[in-house]
Amino acid sequence: MCVYKSNSNNSNPSFIFERTVQEASSNDLFLQPPVSASNTSHSSRSNSFYNLQTISPIPISGSEVRTPSLRKNSNNVSSPLDNVIPTSRSASNSTTSSLAHQEYILNPICNMQNHHHRRRTLENSVAPALDASCSIVNDENTDLSDVDMVYSRRPSSAVSLNMALLARTNSATLPSSESSPASPDLKLSRSHSHSAATRPTLNNINNTGMTTTTSNGEPNSRILRFYSYVDMLNDEKLAQANNTPTSRPPMKSQAYSCPFILKRSPPQAYSSSSATTTFSNPFIKTTELPATSPYVSPQQSARQYSNNANNNAKSPKNRSSSILFQRQSILSNVDPVANMHKNPKFQIESSDSEEEDLTMDMLDPSFPLSSSLRSSANLASNPELATQTPLSTSSSYTAIGKPMPLSTDPSYVSSSNTLSSEHELRVEKVSEVLKKKVSNGGFSTEFNSCDT
């Protein structure tokens, strides 16, 4: 199949690749006046050399006479048209063209029609798609926005790319595709690749069918468009601005919406109670409970149990003080105002003397400064008043209305009067404190007998 293109003057049809060459050669050969014999060889050589340099090599029979002088002259011949139209043939074509030139010199008139026939035969080997593409590219009025690349019906790489990208859109987003006729060809439109109005979105992807369908149910041509990552982000921003849901969730919620991550997330998450009991600092206080809650936290109960075990292992005299510490911890949990001024206490243990342990156990900041000083001064001067003071202190506790979960024995309450604040000056002696503790514990008679 040969594709022709008419000239501007519509005189003679010419070939696309040899349009200018054929016009020049035909005019020179058929309109040339008769010349002398000496100039015939030079003129025919110049014309045939220009003609045959743009044509594929033509085989010549072996019976032809080949002389080295003619081959040498034909290589050195130059025509004025060589400066007008540049040739892109290699140097090897000059040798083959010289062989055809010798055949043309032997019979210039008879071989003219044979050259046309051979050129048409060679022209049939050119692909029609390449021929049409060259005609479109050479046209000055061609607009690239109106050019479509039409592929064959066989499975090509473009179809595989279309299946990989899943960029098949519905005609609802492409109003121009409704007017196009239905064809199975795959088209790549350059005009709509950069426009945001006809850009395909992820909501309109057809994952199953190879061809898209219009609103009327008719199959439409498959369209493959360039859809970059920037276009996807822009579509997501537009969807978020318009409050329209997208098929792909955002990056933050995608990690939580995946079922694989949801299956592994519970072992990695820790509850607040297990975290506080396992990795908590024992010297930092936890959040205070309300006044009506008698709950004791596990940290405080563990600390109280360890303090009681240490005190009871040292001497049996510290049992009352350990019970007082439990009572004070419960009262401190109930009264949040007193805990605001309370600092964390550290117990220093030593085996040299037992007096330091007793003084550390006597500290109680929950009582006022004046009442503790008054009670300590009265007990230091008159040890006999130790049995009378529990009445007033117990009445003061009942007036406040605080719960007493341990016991209502006056001996425990009376021993608490001997405790002083952290910020006051100690005026009592160790012997007096021991005498008071023993008398309150029921061993007053034995202690007095030992003194006498």
Curated annotation (Swiss-Prot):
Annotated gene: MLF3
Family according to the record: To yeast VHS2.
Biased composition (Low complexity): 201-216, 299-321, 365-383
The protein's name in its UniProt record: Protein MLF3
Region Disordered, annotated ranges: 61-94, 171-220, 290-321, 348-402
Biased composition (Polar residues): 64-81, 171-182, 384-398
Other comment: Disruption of the MLF3 gene causes increased sensitivity to the immunosuppressant leflunomide.
One GO BP: establishment or maintenance of actin cytoskeleton polarity
Positions carrying Phosphoserine: 8, 11, 14, 56, 74, 79, 145, 156, 160, 171, 183, 189, 228, 257, 265, 297, 320, 353, 439
Subcellular location: Cytoplasm
